Design a protein with these regions (language model features):
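Rossmann-fold cofactor-recognition segment
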Residues: 57-68
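NAD(P)H-binding glycine-rich loop region in Rossmannoid oxidoreductase-like domains
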Residues: 66-105, 113-116, 133
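N-terminal Rossmann NAD(P)H-binding glycine-rich loop of SDR-like oxidoreductase domains
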Residues: 11-39
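Hydrophobic/aromatic anchor residues within beta-strands of the central parallel beta-sheet
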Residues: 61, 99, 122, 178-181
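Active-site Tyr-X1-5-Lys
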Residues: 151-182
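SDR active-site strand-loop-helix element
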Residues: 22, 47, 83-87, 122-128, ...
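Conserved glycine-rich Rossmann-like NAD(P)H-binding loop of the short-chain dehydrogenase/reductase
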Residues: 41-51
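Conserved Rossmann-fold NAD(P)-dependent oxidoreductase catalytic core, especially the SDR/UDP-sugar
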Residues: 109-155, 179
Length: 186
């Protein structure tokens, strides 16, 4: 029986924490994967539709669609300790329907997998842009501010909906520690 403690690389000690990163082949995904990879407490698995050339040798990469059975199997067949979801498609060649299906449908499936397979921690990357730039906004917005970007910027609709899905998940799956990151650029 596992104590839940991570296994050091090459050791027979306690189990390493499995962190699944979506969007691992993207710029930010690579940075996060490499940072966590250097910590011997973590085992990194990535889900991305794109290949991940140059990945560290002990990082497992699944080149799959987030909505697929193969993606679900990553959660079903192995104890996942955390999900870092950064797998949002920004392909200008994709149709609105394709983007919606991938982004919103994929996020919905991932949250479903986390609830079904008892993933204790979920981090969803959003953006401060979901608040929408409005002249009546105060200088500093709180997390309680409404997400109004989709009203003026249709391209933001998927990201706003993903944020809403994660917020709803936060309240529905109270036993899962859920974090929504809304970084802002300077």
């Amino acid at each position: 029986m596992s104590s839940g403690e991570p296994v050091p690389r090459g050791g027979d000690g306690p189990r390493r924490k499995k962190v699944v990163i979506t969007g691992i082949a993207g710029r930010l995904g690579r940075v996060v994967a490499r940072a966590l990879h250097h910590d011997p407490r973590f085992l990194i698995e990535g889900l991305d539709r794109r290949p991940f050339p140059g990945k560290p040798k002990d990082v497992i990469h699944h080149q799959v669609d987030l909505r697929s059975k193969k993606a679900r199997d990553v959660f079903r067949t192995g104890e996942v300790d955390a999900l870092i979801h950064m797998g949002v498609m920004h392909d200008p060649r994709a149709t609105t329907a394709e983007l919606y299906s991938w982004n919103v449908g994929g996020t919905s499936k991932l949250l479903e997998y986390c609830a079904t397979y008892n993933v204790p921690k979920v981090v969803v990357l959003s953006s401060a842009n979901v608040y929408g730039p409005r002249p009546e906004n105060p200088q500093f917005l709180t997390e309680e501010a409404p997400l109004l970007a989709a009203q003026r910027f249709p391209a933001m609709r998927d990201l706003v909906e993903i944020d809403h899905l994660a917020s709803t998940f936060f309240w529905k799956a109270r036993d899962i520690e859920t974090v929504i990151l809304r970084p802002v650029s300077r």
